Amino acid sequence: MTPITPIEAPLPKGVTDFLPEKADKIGYIEGKIRKVFELWGFRRIITPLLEFEDVIAAGLGDDLKAKTFRFDDRQSGKLIAVPSDITPQIARIVATRLRGYPLPHRICYSGRVLRHAELQSGRSREIFQSGVELIGLDSPEADAEMVTMAVEALKGLGFRDFKIDLGHVGFIRGIMTASGLEVAVRNRLQEAIGKKDVSAVRSILAESPLSDAAKDELAALPRLFGGREVLDEAGRVATNDTSRRALDNISQVLDLLDIHGVSDHLTIDLGEVRGLDYHTGLTFEGFVTGMGEAVCSGGRYDTLTARYGFPAPATGFTFNVLALLSALEKRPDVEASKTRDILIFNQQDDRREALEIAQQLRRRGYTTARDIIRRNFDDSLDYARRMNILHMMVVGGDQCGPDEVYLVRVADGQGQRIKKAEVFSERFSLDAGPDKES
């Protein structure tokens, strides 16, 4: 018999197949996040995979426009885009489909976007987003809701050692505008401030014609990072009204976050330059210990829906699900997925009883698979272990009597006999599990 040669079936760079174990973990993460969103009164929207390029581009910054996948639509003759971010889609939907509905809109979503990545960057072109948008409220309370939900979702996933960095584009924008620097110089300075590169900031300022007072104001930005005391230092540094209003806004949000009980996870970074061309107020990013990239990010964007003809204040944030997956996989102490509960191993010729037991277990909410392939006990146990199944229930055979099943804990092979009548009773539970050899 001629051996079959496996075909080569490579994937494009920047995308991957997620096999059952990782797919389970992604579903687990998304489910935990969605539960928090729903508890806060947010309702799900499912956005399309395609948009007309000119429509989606109206809601994108220059960076995301450059990363958007485009192609010609055979039906309309127009340019089609695969969205590189879901928030502009939500803005379009609110401005058109939900225009007549009362405000505020509490919307959540979960989906994938595509972004071009630099050839040598090694970054994924496929991004899993789970996020919320609160549209129609311009208040510190709305901003505080976003931050609190981010904290609650991270705690729900089992994280304890994480921080949410709070910034405010109004603060840094006010200082930059008051400086009167040329746009090119301002962009260089913002990049250096964002990297916390103090020497580069000083070098750029040394070449500028600004007064010593203005230089001191700008040079202070990279060090305005820490706890609430940063606001006092920033108040001494900033002299313009825009920056002072931003500090007052952050202070109000912090008061509310203290009431929500999440202050222990907060830091303030007034040198944050992310989203200066997009955000309009408070911004934030979430970081988990051991991860260099943010696992969530968001903030206020009061001008986005106006680009679609419906001016409304808005705030929101999104989780990077794959970043969360990487963080969870580095933490063996954190549950990262829901494993399968039971594998039914039938050693009887008659299938009826095994089928009935499996059906009963599913009614009780236990995920239950049958090992339909005929194999021995050890091979079935090995299969259960490799498929990440917690328990194997043996029906028939030498391990149990005619009125019993044998329940095995897959992790260590320990098992116990259980009466079949108990399996069909309301008191049956897997919580305790086998605790002794029988």
Curated annotation (Swiss-Prot):
Keyword terms: Amino-acid biosynthesis, Cytoplasm, Histidine biosynthesis
Subcellular location: Cytoplasm
Assigned GO CC terms: cytoplasm
InterPro entries: aa-tRNA-synth_II (IPR006195), aa-tRNA-synth_II/BPL/LPL (IPR045864), Anticodon-bd_dom_sf (IPR036621), HisRS-like_core (IPR041715), HisRS/HisZ (IPR004516), HisZ (IPR004517)
GO biological process: L-histidine biosynthetic process; tRNA aminoacylation for protein translation
Predominant localisation class: cytoplasm
MF (Gene Ontology): catalytic activity, acting on a tRNA
Signal peptide: none
Pathway(s) annotated for this protein in UniProt: Amino-acid biosynthesis; L-histidine biosynthesis; L-histidine from 5-phospho-alpha-D-ribose 1-diphosphate: step 1/9
Pfam families associated with the record: tRNA-synt_His
Domain of life of the organism encoding this protein: Bacteria
Similarity comment: Belongs to the class-II aminoacyl-tRNA synthetase family. HisZ subfamily.
Function: Required for the first step of histidine biosynthesis. May allow the feedback regulation of ATP phosphoribosyltransferase activity by histidine.
Miscellaneous information on this protein: This function is generally fulfilled by the C-terminal part of HisG, which is missing in some bacteria such as this one.
HAMAP family: HisZ
Quaternary data: Heteromultimer composed of HisG and HisZ subunits.
Protein name: ATP phosphoribosyltransferase regulatory subunit
